[in-house]
Amino acid sequence: MMELLAPAGGYEALTAAVQNGADAVYMGFGAFNARRSAKNFTDEEFASAVRYCHLRGVRVFLTLNTLLTDRELPGAAAALRKASAMGVDAVLVQDWGLLTLAKEIVPDLPLHASTQMSLFTLGGANAAAALGMERVVLARELDRDEVREICAGCGAEIEVFGHGALCMCYSGQCEMSAVLGQRSGNRGACAQPCRLPYGVNGPCRDAHPLSLKDANLSAYLRDMSSMGVACLKLEGRLKRPEYVAVVTGIYRRLLDEKRLPTAEESRALEQAFSRSGFTDGYWLGRKGKPMFGTRPENVPEPKELFARARETYENGKENRKIPVNLRLTVRRGEPVRLGGACAVPGGVTIVMATGDMPEEARNRAVTEEELRQRLTKTGGTVFAADQIEIDLDEGLMVSASAVNALRRELLDELADRRMDTPKRRELPASPLPEAPAGAAELDFTVSISRPDQLTAELLAERPAIVYIPAELLDKMDLTPYIGQAEFCAVLPRIFRTADEPVFRDILQRHPEVASAAIGNLGHLAIVKGLGKTLRGDFGLNVYNSRAVLFWQEQGLSSVTASFELRWQQVRDLGKYADCEALVYGRLPLMITENCVTKNSVGCAHGAGSVLTDRRGEQFPVLCAYGCRCEIENGKTLVLADKPEVFRCGLRYGRLRFTTETAAECAALLRAHRAGTVTADDNSTRGLFYRGVE
C-alpha cells in the first residue's frame, strides 16, 4: 500500500500524526531543514520521537534539505551521524555537497532526494537513483501522466505531494524571499512574499497573482496507487497539531477503505485550513486562475473540529495497538514460561519470559480463563493480545502478580526490540583536496535572452563565453561569429521528460556550439555522449566546496556560484574549480509553471508583463521556455565596480542580459572591459555583501 507521510513540526504534531495513522513522519532538528520556523526538536526530543515512532511501526525521515555553506557542513555532518545512530529511517537532502558527505560518513543511511532538488523528469529521477537516492520527491507541478511515466521508468521510489500549501515557484529555484529580504527559501527561512498583493501591468491593489490555493488530491489516491506512487506526502510542518490530526486521519481512512472522501470529510479538510478552497489543477494539467486563492485574516478556529481532533491523540491516547501472539505454559515441575511474538521491521521477533515453579493448588486451581484474562490486560502499552494459547496442567496455582510480572517483562522486551536501532557504519569524512593556485584574471561572459541581443558589436568586446538559450539556437545563424567566442547552449531550468530528446537533437544540430550549461540534474541525460564541454548554471544551487567537487565528478568544467553567497563564501568555491558568478543583470526571483501574465491580463504572446508590489517596486515578468514565467528583480545587479569581485577567485563574471537592448548589451560589456561600470539608484549589490539567513 502507498505510504502515508505526515508532517511533524513539534512533538504534539508528531503524536497527532502517529495516532491518526501516519505510516511515516518527516521532521527536523537543528537549523538545517526547510522549515526553520517550525518548532522542530532538540536532540533529546528527536531521539525520544524516533523511539516513540518505531515502537508503533512508524518510520522517521529527517529533513536536512537546505543549502549549506562550507562552515556549516561540519555541523550537518554531526547531525547526520546523530540521525544514523538514533535509527532514523532516511534523510531528505537538497545540497549536493551534503549528499556526497552523507554517502561518505554514513553510507548505510538511506537518502531521499528532496523536492528542493527540482526533479521533474525521468532522466532527473534516474540520475538521482544512480547517485544512491532510494526515493525521489517529485516537483508539485507535474500532472498525473508525467508522474505515471516517471513511476514506470525510475529505479527509485517516487514520492508525490498530496495535500497542503503550494509554492508559486518551483521548489529549489525561488530567490524572491532571499533577494528581497535576505530570508532564503533554500535555507528554511522563506518569508512567503508570494502571499502578498501585487498589481500586474498596473498599481498594486488587492490582487494576489502569486498566491496558489492549497493542493487537495484526496480524490485521486487510487489513481496514484495504481501507477506505482510509493509515498503520499502531506504538507504542514508549520501547521497546528490539530490540523495534522484531521488531515492525516482522513487520508488514512481513504487509503485503507479505497474510496473517495465524503462531503463531510471534504468540509473537514477545508475547515482545517484552506485558501478559498483547494486545487487539483497541476495533477489534472489544468493551470490558470482557478488555482489561485487567499486566506482572509482572522479566520475563526474550527473549535469543534479541532476539539475532536485533540481527542485522538491527547492524554496518552493509543490508537495504534500492535498485535502480539502469546503462549503461556504452566506445567508441573517446570518454571512458568510466557512466549510472545510480534512483527518487527523485516520479520517477526520472539521473546520468552520465565518465572517460578507453579504451586499445587490448596483450595482452588487456576483456570485457563483466568490466565487468559490476565494476559489480555495490556493497557498502558502499545500492544494488544491477538492470539493466546495456554498449556495448563490441572491442579496448579499461579498468582495473578506472577502472571502480570511475566507479561510486563515480555512486553517490555518486545518494545525494546521494536525500537532497536540498526547497526550502521560511521566513517570519517575525506578531507578536501589541496586547493590549486588561484584562478587566472577574471574574464567576462554574457548571457542573452533574445536573438537580437547577439551582435557583432557585442562580440567585438571579446566575451569569453556567450550563453544562448538552447531553444533559440534554431532561430539564429551563428556562422558569422564562429571563432569570436565560445558559444554555450543554456538548457532550460524547467522542462519535462518529453523535452529530453528535443534538446538532445538541438544540441546535435549545432556543432558550432561548443558547450552546454547544466542547470538541473536531469540535464545530464540530455548531454550524455555529445562531446560538449559542460558548464554549471545557477539553477544547480552550488553553495559549498563539496558541491563544486561533486559537479566536477559529473564532468563539469566550471560552476556558477549561488547568488545567495557573500563574496567571502564565493572565494572558497573558486579554490577548487573555475567558478563563475553573476556580476551584472536582473536576478531571477521565481520561475513558475503558471503564467502570471496570462492569468491576470491575458496572454502577451511572449511580451511578458510587470509586477508591482505595495511599495511601488516593479518586477519584470518574462516568458520562459514552455510558456512558463520568470519574475526578475526590479533592480539591476552591479558588482564589477567593487574590488572584491576581482579578489574572490572568480574565473568568470557573467553579465546577464534580459530586458536590455542590443546596443545596451554591447555598451555594458564595453564598460565592464574598461572598468567604468558604476552603480546608481536603480542598481543593487544583491546578496554579495549581505548574504542570507
What is the role of each PLM region?
Residues 1-119, 137-141, 146-231, 238-693:
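Active-site pocket-lining/capping segments in soluble small-molecule metabolic enzymes
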Residues 134:
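Long, basic N-terminal domains or extensions that often function
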